[in-house]
Design a protein with these regions (language model features):
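Hydrophobic secretory-pathway targeting helix
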Residues: 2-31
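Second-shell loop/turn segments in exported
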Residues: 29-32, 86-88, 124-128, 153-159, ...
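Short, conserved catalytic-motif segment at the N-terminal edge
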Residues: 32-89, 125, 173
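Short, charged, amphipathic alpha-helices and their helix-cap/turn boundaries
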Residues: 38-39, 71, 79, 118, ...
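Active-site helix/loop module of the DD-peptidase/beta-lactamase fold
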Residues: 54, 88-92, 104-151, 174, ...
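Carbohydrate-binding/catalytic loop surfaces
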Residues: 231-255, 261-262, 318-320, 324
Length: 520
């Protein structure tokens, strides 16, 4: 969906080598009041700069929740945001699903290196031979070969039936893999939805029941939910989207379907997610309760594929070296940071933890803007910096086109509109031209040809460069980024639609003019 998750996080690390009022507070004496004021000031400043209605954060140190805080509002009525307010956490569902799978590994119910077909005998993709080679580990490491864009189409399903998850996985029998299992990395929800079905099949419970009983309950995640209805009952925040640059409540496109629950459909609060991070930082322990062994936690955190010497993907976690924190580690060593982000229309979320520094942060925001995601995610990493006594990062930005996509599209569409008016006027004059105006006719022919070239270049650039690079389609843009999608449609209407009509009219009028000249 939109900018791809890993590219957003990686961009941060490349650069690294209403008046909002705090509305809830909880902290222990591990932090000074001055440090907490700095955190509050930073978050409020970012909210103002990025026009974010509401934010909730949490900071963990060792086995303690150091600080939780809510800022701004949770809805248009001005309800105060708190650290207990539920959010749609989108892809933060993935590390939760990965934890569930690892619990089943510990119980001996599943083998990471076994093929999916061992547990789902009917499981198929288009290539039957390849079907038997996709393992559980491939799914966890996002190396199965499934296509990212196709998974976003599945996100739009509204099927909430008991059979929905299994039926969606059975429908993969026509899926073409982008590469052989284990050969490369491609982030896709499909992998984790299959894992969710495995949890459901091997546990004998629904995915939702398992997550609630085996993860939410032991971690005291009382404001975490596996259904939209439950989250709304817990007073979840509304989501906001910058519709043509105006922040607007826009959360109707929710994950109603059970199909995407394991990959992107869970709900939680900042307070609850600090409990989840404590278990990650403390070898699977939370308040004396072990939800997973130290060995299995280590497996979850170990990269299965490397993007570079300093970056890789583990099981539900991206793993990076964090050089900016070397000054606060023993022996000035460069610590490893683990992170995952979540995006949906109206919601942005981020988890970060640094095991060597025993520090973790939760960042939940009730706004999503595909043009500002690097800036959003850098807030989370800056909070991690502040939490260990360092200065926040310099503000991050998307690439020029990404950051200014709405303005650029609007300018192009206006220019195309002006060009359309000009072309209509010229075409109306063309039939009256006589032989003495042949030079003007030739000039107009050149102008029309140049317009056609510009139209073709814009259409090709959008359809074959911009959209494929962002793993997007016009249809998905209209659903997940409606204003940008609408401008894409207008651009294509002007270039391919009107451009074709204009060219045909010019050719017809030229023929009429030639006949008129011949008659004279």
């Amino acid at each position: 969906m939109l900018y791809r998750y890993f590219l957003k996080v990686a961009s941060i690390f490349t650069i690294m080598g209403l008046i909002f009022v705090p509305t809830s507070r909880q902290f222990v004496a591990a932090e000074s009041y001055k440090e907490l004021q700095e955190i509050d000031s930073y978050v409020l400043g970012q909210m103002k700069d990025l026009d974010i209605p509401g934010v909730a954060i949490g900071i963990v140190r060792g086995d303690q929740v150091v600080y939780t805080q809510g800022y701004g509002v949770a809805d248009d009525a001005g309800r105060a945001m708190t650290s207990d307010t539920p959010f749609l956490i989108a892809s933060l569902s993935k590390p939760i699903t990965a934890l569930g799978i690892m619990q089943l590994v510990e119980e001996g119910k599943i083998n990471l290196d076994a093929p999916v077909q061992m547990y789902l005998p009917w499981f198929r993709v288009a290539d039957e031979e390849v079907s038997s080679k996709i393992t559980i580990r491939h799914l966890l490491h996002q190396t199965s070969g499934f296509d990212e864009r196709e998974s976003y189409v599945r996100n739009l399903s509204t099927d909430s039936s008991v059979e929905a998850l299994e039926m969606s996985i059975r429908a993969l029998n026509t899926a073409e893999l982008n590469f052989a299992p284990g050969e490369a990395f491609e982030y896709t929800n499909t992998n984790y939805d299959i894992l969710g079905l495995l949890i459901q099949t091997l546990s004998g419970q629904s995915y939702e029941q398992y997550i609630e009983e085996k993860i939410f309950d032991p971690l005291d995640m009382d404001q975490s939910y596996t259904s939209l209805e439950g989250a709304r009952g817990g007073n979840m925040t509304r989501g906001y989207y910058p519709f043509f640059g105006i922040t607007t409540a826009y959360d109707h496109l929710m994950p109603y379907s059970r199909i995407v629950k394991p990959s992107a459909g869970l709900f939680s609060s900042a307070e609850d997610l600090t409990h989840f991070l404590i278990a990650q930082l403390n070898q699977g322990q939370y308040q004396g309760n072990a939800i997973l062994s130290e060995e299995r936690i280590a497996t979850l955190h170990t990269p299965g594929i490397q993007f570079s010497e300093n970056a890789g993907y583990a099981m539900g976690w991206s793993v990076f070296s964090f050089p900016d924190m070397a000054s606060v580690t023993p022996n000035n060593s460069i610590p490893i940071g683990l992170t995952h982000a979540g995006e949906w229309v109206g919601y942005t979320s981020l988890l970060v933890f640094i095991p060597e520094l025993e520090t973790g942060i939760v960042l939940l925001m009730n706004k999503h803007d595909p043009a500002r995601m690097p800036e959003y995610f850098s807030i989370g990493w800056s909070l991690a910096m502040l939490a260990v006594g360092l200065e926040p990062l310099e503000p991050q930005s998307a690439d020029f086109i990404g950051k200014n996509i709405r303005v650029l599209l609007a300018v192009v569409i206006v220019l195309l509109g002006i060009g359309a008016v000009w072309a209509v006027r010229k075409l109306r004059q063309l039939p009256s031209k006589s032989g003495s105006d042949s030079r003007q006719n030739q000039k107009l022919a050149i102008q029309m040809t140049l317009l056609a070239i510009v139209d073709l270049a814009l259409a090709v650039g959008l359809l074959f460069i911009r959209l494929p690079e962002s793993k997007d389609t016009i249809f998905l843009s209209l659903r997940f980024n409606p204003d940008i999608g609408l401008m894409y449609v207008l651009l294509l209407m002007f270039t391919l639609g009107w451009g074709t009509i204009r060219t045909l009219l010019f050719l017809r009028q030229s023929l009429k003019t030639n006949k008129l000249e011949n008659a004279i």
